[in-house]
């Protein structure tokens, strides 16, 4: 038996990959734990866009995530990503193009008619995708439960795979928190079919369609371990950026706000680590939905080999 601690994206992907490999697994949800920060994610599968600031390993290995998610959950939308900048920030768009790959220049209105005439040009990353994080995590959980995987509180009975995110910081000395803040809005006045990233020198943002006029707007990146509600500054910056994309966002209803602490190692690269008999899958930073399946697959291969040698 393998006991996976935590039911966020890292834990559910790990449990799924271990179960796929035919290994006995259970998921331990710590009593009184807050909801996984994964549910606040953008749910963008955007390895090429991440190349603007992320190490090459995120770009190359993250490409495998799209096929993994499509094989395991419904609702993966392969419509690509559109990257824009206000006219005064046109240099940022050129810089983004130089720092990334697998894109082409487009007239934004040709892809998103609601943006016609608002931006002269944009970058289109056609091989990227997005999904609703809450729905995806719910689908993984449901599949595991159908397979007979137990979700429970209490003491683990098997080999421990620790996927508790920032809650594991006492055992991982170099794990730090990066605070993220997001909004969810609804408006019938804007129709977007794919994630739109707006570049900005101080507060870049992304807008992810959730269907039925709902949009997730995120996400701030603050080097802080402070919990608590969203700040007024974050709300103003995110809504200001959304307004730049389309003025109708000014009339949108804010239906939810969220904050979370992203678990991050110094190099911001998610990793599998060993501490005695305990295996940690952590450090997801802003790459949870992109890298959790990759590490989960690696974990399942590693544990399959080890258990085979143990017999």
Per-range role (PLM):
Residues 20-38:
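Glycine-rich FAD pyrophosphate-binding loop
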Residues 123-155, 159, 163:
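Helical element adjacent to the flavin cofactor pocket in flavoenzyme catalytic cores
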Residues 253-311:
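C-terminal catalytic lobe of FAD-dependent flavoproteins
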Residues 53-64, 123-139, 229-234, 291:
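Short beta-strand to alpha-helix junction loop
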Residues 2-26:
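N-terminal Rossmann-like FAD-binding beta1-loop-alpha1 element of flavoenzymes
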Residues 43-113:
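Dinucleotide-binding Rossmann-like beta1-alpha1 core, especially the glycine-rich loop
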Residues 5, 156-166, 296:
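Short hydrophobic core segments
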Residues 16-17, 21, 39, 75-76, ...:
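Active-site substrate-recognition segment that forms the wall
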